[in-house]
Amino acid sequence: MLKTTPLNAAHRGMHAKMVDFGGWDMPLHYGSQLDEHHAVRRDAGMFDVSHMLTVDLHGENVRQFLRGLVANNIDKLTVPGKALYTCMLNPAGGIIDDLIIYFLSESWFRLVVNAGTADKDIDWITLQSSQHAPDLTITPRRDLAMIAVQGPNARAKVWAVIPDSKAASEDLKPFQSVAFGNYFIARTGYTGEDGFEITLPADEAAAFWQKLHAAGVAPAGLGSRDTLRLEAGMNLYGQDMDETTNPLESGLAWTVDLKSERDFIGKQALLEKPVNQQLVGLVLLDKGVLRNHQKIITQHEGIAGEGEITSGGFSPTLNQSIALARIPVGIAAGEQVHVVVRDKQLAARVVKYPFVRNGQALI
């Protein structure tokens, strides 16, 4: 039996193509994945992300607990409402999950974790809490829904639906949030566009979704969500990284604090293990399409090497095939590699991602 979000009936009412997404019954598209992609890049689209799990941590020692739990430095969070993107690592430095942490008060931090890892994450956090912070209260919030409204006109359309929220949210900078009535409004997203991710009571989600639709926000499914995040150069857990890879070889070194004296789970392993691989962007030069798991052949300073595409596909904004790929270190942007597609080797150029940000091509 598939799990459903509070918006399941709304998706079906909009004739969504529904698919099994990690055990959840989720919309792939509502007719045209391409139109949904362009709506987000050019105007505003909305995604049901209620399958992701909000987890509230309460207790007097939450900050100290998180200092040891995650790789990024939780002490960057000094102003209530500020958010931090980070990885949670195992002792070997492998990525258990990537998540966002919101600082709400010294005794209340909010985590948003991926749907496919939610149970594993809760088990891990509970285990670590039992050892290091037994008084911590861990509350999974399945009573909440989350809707992401993304695009250059996204914020204005949210304000049209919740007029009173404008004063509270218009000065939010990226990775800041504010509570407004029953709404928790964060200026975050997974598309490379501006917008809000809005958390609200599950029983209010369907009415809010319909109001957004009436205000001209296009419903968008998992298909366009994936092409948008790929263009934005944003990692997808389970494809671009997992427990067998670490942040330093996954393009996430910027989320790891190795400079402070603070210790965290996985830090020692990261310090000891040489980094032999890197995550890069690829743009296909020959005719074809880049796909996940395709093999890459590299040549660098006379040494042959191999890599693999972690996320590949067609970019509607750029009108060409792009990918994220893990290849040997040392190969720089501008160099060429070859991708094995069936029995052919297709040329691709290594680029620095993101490929697209705020509607503009960056390559």
UniProtKB/Swiss-Prot annotation:
InterPro entries linked: GCS_T, GCS_T_bac, GCST_C, GCV_T_N, GcvT/YgfZ/DmdA, GcvT/YgfZ_C, TrmE/GcvT_dom1
EC number(s) per entry: 2.1.2.10
GO molecular function: aminomethyltransferase activity; transaminase activity
Top-level taxonomic group: Bacteria
GO CC term (a single one): glycine cleavage complex
Enzyme class: transferase
Keywords, ordered alphabetically: Aminotransferase, Transferase
GO biological process assignments: glycine decarboxylation via glycine cleavage system
Catalysis performed (reactions): N(6)-[(R)-S(8)-aminomethyldihydrolipoyl]-L-lysyl-[protein] + (6S)-5,6,7,8-tetrahydrofolate = N(6)-[(R)-dihydrolipoyl]-L-lysyl-[protein] + (6R)-5,10-methylene-5,6,7,8-tetrahydrofolate + NH4(+)
Quaternary structure (record): The glycine cleavage system is composed of four proteins: P, T, L and H.
Family label: Belongs to the GcvT family.
HAMAP family: GcvT
Protein function: The glycine cleavage system catalyzes the degradation of glycine.
Protein name: Aminomethyltransferase
Species name: Nitrosomonas eutropha (strain DSM 101675 / C91 / Nm57)
Biological classification of the source: Bacteria, Pseudomonadati, Pseudomonadota, Betaproteobacteria, Nitrosomonadales
